[in-house]
Each structure stands twice: as structure tokens, then as C-alpha cells.
């Protein structure tokens, strides 16, 4: 993962952890957890691509990796919709900036995961 993407994940996770969204803080914690999970998954795909011979290992280790990939895309789409919803309802500029950056990062990571997965197919 390039250093910009790593710092973007770290920055957004830090910003989200500082937000207090009242009754929806449980939802925010869920979003943070999914962001962290997405980062780990993206990193593991990148590592597999870097070691192209690792495709067989990836398939052997997880025979359902395509299903897992599909699930990650569903999670990304859910996060994108959740972030868009938060953008519409928040009036706090700190939160707006954070969610705009989160949305941009999600779109970038979705594209990276697509690129990695096509290289693995």
C-alpha cells in the first residue's frame, strides 16, 4: 500500500474516533471497524499481487476467495452509502471534511481492490 493510502486510512480512522455522533456512535464504531477490516484485506490482496506466484497459495488457503472478494465489495458499497448519508445529515464542517475524505478513500480503495483482483484472476 502506498504511503498516501496508509496515511489516509490512519487519518480518517483517527478523525472518526474523535467524532461524537450522539446515539449513532455505535454505528460510527461499526464503520471504523469495517474501515480497519477493509484496510487489512486490501493489504493482503496487494501482498498476493506482489508475489504473483502466491495466487495458488491464496486459493488453497481460502477456496472461496472470490466469494470473499464479492463480500468486500458489498461492504465497500455499504460504507459508501453510509458515508454519503452522513454527509447529507451533518452540519459540522469537521465531520463533513472527514466524511468527504472517507468517501474519496473508499472509492480509491475500491478501484485498487478491483485492479489487484483482476491481476490475480
Swiss-Prot record:
InterPro entries membership: Flu_NS2
Cell compartments where the protein resides: Virion; Host nucleus
Keywords for the protein's UniProt record, in alphabetical order: Host nucleus, Host-virus interaction, Transport, Virion
Source taxon at top rank: Viruses
First-listed, main subcellular location of the protein, grouped into a coarse class: virion
GO cellular component: host cell nucleus; virion component
Cited Pfam families: Flu_NS2 (PF00601)
GO biological process: exit of virus from host cell nucleus through nuclear pore
Motif placement: Nuclear export signal: 12-21, 85-94
Assembly mode: Interacts with protein M1. May interact with host nucleoporin RAB/HRB and exportin XPO1/CRM1.
Biological role: Mediates the nuclear export of encapsidated genomic RNAs (ribonucleoproteins, RNPs). Acts as an adapter between viral RNPs complexes and the nuclear export machinery of the cell. Possesses no intrinsic RNA-binding activity, but includes a C-terminal M1-binding domain. This domain is believed to allow recognition of RNPs bound to the protein M1.
Family: Belongs to the influenza viruses NEP family.
Protein name according to UniProt: Nuclear export protein
Phylogenetic classification of the source organism: Viruses, Riboviria, Orthornavirae, Negarnaviricota, Polyploviricotina
Amino acid at each position: 500500500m502506498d504511503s498516501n493510502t496508509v496515511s489516509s486510512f490512519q487519518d480518517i480512522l483517527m478523525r472518526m474516533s474523535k467524532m461524537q455522533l450522539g446515539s449513532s456512535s455505535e454505528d460510527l464504531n461499526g464503520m471504523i471497524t469495517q474501515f480497519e477490516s477493509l484496510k487489512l484485506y486490501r493489504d493482503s490482496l496487494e501482498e498476493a499481487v506482489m508475489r504473483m506466484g502466491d495466487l495458488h497459495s491464496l486459493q488453497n488457503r481460502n477456496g472461496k476467495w472470490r466469494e470473499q472478494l464479492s463480500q468486500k465489495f458489498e461492504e465497500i458499497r455499504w460504507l459508501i452509502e453510509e458515508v454519503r448519508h452522513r454527509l447529507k445529515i451533518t452540519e459540522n464542517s469537521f465531520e463533513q471534511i472527514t466524511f468527504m475524505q472517507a468517501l474519496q478513500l473508499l472509492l480509491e480503495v475500491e478501484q485498487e481492490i478491483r485492479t489487484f483482483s483482476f491481476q490475480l484472476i
